[in-house]
From Swiss-Prot:
Cofactor: Mg(2+); Mn(2+)
HAMAP family cross-referenced by the UniProt entry: DXP_reductoisom
Catalytic reaction annotation: 2-C-methyl-D-erythritol 4-phosphate + NADP(+) = 1-deoxy-D-xylulose 5-phosphate + NADPH + H(+)
Binding site for 1-deoxy-D-xylulose 5-phosphate: 125, 151-152, 186, 209, 222, 227-228, 231
Gene: dxr
Chain residues that bind Mn(2+): 150, 152, 231
Biological process annotations from GO: isopentenyl diphosphate biosynthetic process, methylerythritol 4-phosphate pathway involved in terpenoid biosynthetic process
Pathway assigned to this chain's UniProt record: Isoprenoid biosynthesis; isopentenyl diphosphate biosynthesis via DXP pathway; isopentenyl diphosphate from 1-deoxy-D-xylulose 5-phosphate: step 1/6
Name recorded for this polypeptide: 1-deoxy-D-xylulose 5-phosphate reductoisomerase
Binding-site residues, NADPH: 10-13, 37-38, 124, 126, 215
Keywords: Isoprene biosynthesis, Manganese, Metal-binding, NADP, Oxidoreductase
Span of the signal peptide: none
Described purpose of this protein according to its UniProt entry: Catalyzes the NADPH-dependent rearrangement and reduction of 1-deoxy-D-xylulose-5-phosphate (DXP) to 2-C-methyl-D-erythritol 4-phosphate (MEP).
Amino acid sequence: MKKITILGSTGSIGINALSIIQKNPDLFKVIALVANKNFSIMLRQCELFSPDWVAMRDEKSAHILRKKLKHSKINTQVLTGEKDICALAALEETDHVISAIVGMAGLLPTLSAIHAGKTILLANKESLITSGYFFMKALSSSGAKIIPIDSEHNAIFQVLPLEIQKNLGKTTLEKNSIKHLVLTGSGGPFYKFSSSDLSNVTPDQACSHPNWLMGKKISVDSATMMNKGLEYAEARWLFNALESEIKILIHPESIIHSMVQYYDGSLLAQLSAPDIRTSISYAMSWPDRICTEVDYLNFYKINNLTFFEPDFTQFPCLKLAIDAFSQGQASMTVLNAANEIAVSSFLDSKISFTKIYEINMEILMSSCFSEPKCIQDILEIDRKVRILAKNKVSSLIF
């Protein structure tokens, strides 16, 4: 039985992971759950899974949860704050840690789990793309393992040789007869929109993905295709891939989740219905597979599968992320921080959809940070850029 801690249990990934655990109680046991401030969902999760520990980032939410658990006579211990979250990520009794906290807030807890030698099931791509070198170095020195949850990287992982699966980031694609990886993306809800149409889209429209059910932040990132740019960076680190070894392909139907081109001409792809439970369950059960109750593909009902190259003019955030990766770790940290503020501001209806790119581009172009020498440097860059981005948003409002 695998013992699980979930960082971000009240979000989309966490809720889906728990649904898989609920259907496979003989395979998994929940040890600890971590969330920000949604005590209502956390209370229900405690009632269903009886974790030993819970941590809420928000102190007020932790206080309310303690009262409700006591009233329900549930013995789960409630902690609060970043230090306690990092402690739960490193619990000795935990085998696997699902890293699903949204954004930069997931960095330190994920690193804590890595330093403790856990198997990390990674959904929080921001922790990897902002601290890539330090992240991969910590993996190597601690003996921790990493399995991606993102559907694209999980799809690639599924069709890679076992040697790479066991040693992500430590070997090269060429040594394993791989010519390149193909990251697919749906193009989001706006891939047919004109530039003028994009100026007027609403947060609700941006969060209405045609194929996937996701959280708000990643839904907006999908709509701008920033998400695909971040996934490009994630793939560069995870698979130790060169720039020439990653291709990006728009695939609106979201049936083929990614592909691996081998030197012998074989192109291996992972296909499934667009349901994140497939990749979560594979990460949780690897190297085995378990039942998820995800619908099977019915090829008689699939009229066609379409593909085309991404248009960087229509999706400038994608190009921005690819270029930022080539510039170094500081640039990726800057872009990630600026984007988190810009997306949050759009969701709060403070800025228009097209301003997300403008803010990202202006902050990235105007920032000049030395390459980070440690995690603290990354956190400091992140802190300063968030201030710059918030000031930029304010200047657009007033």
